[in-house]
Amino acid sequence: MKYSLEKKEDYAIFNLQEENLNSLIAPKLKSEFIFLRNEGVEHLILDMNGVKYVDSSGLSAILTANR
């Protein structure tokens, strides 16, 4: 999974650099979101500018970030 992460004082910007957010990528994305949450990141901006397709597992990963 390709992404960039920019941490600011009050938030982080997670830029997903993949065309598809599907069952191959979703578990890795969930893990990253959980890791960031455990590190104390409370506000996350998810930049999906390059993503062209999201399946149900991708949507589930996004919802993980909202918890």
Name these PLM-found stretches.
Residues 20-67:
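Amphipathic alpha-helical interaction surfaces in cytosolic regulatory modules
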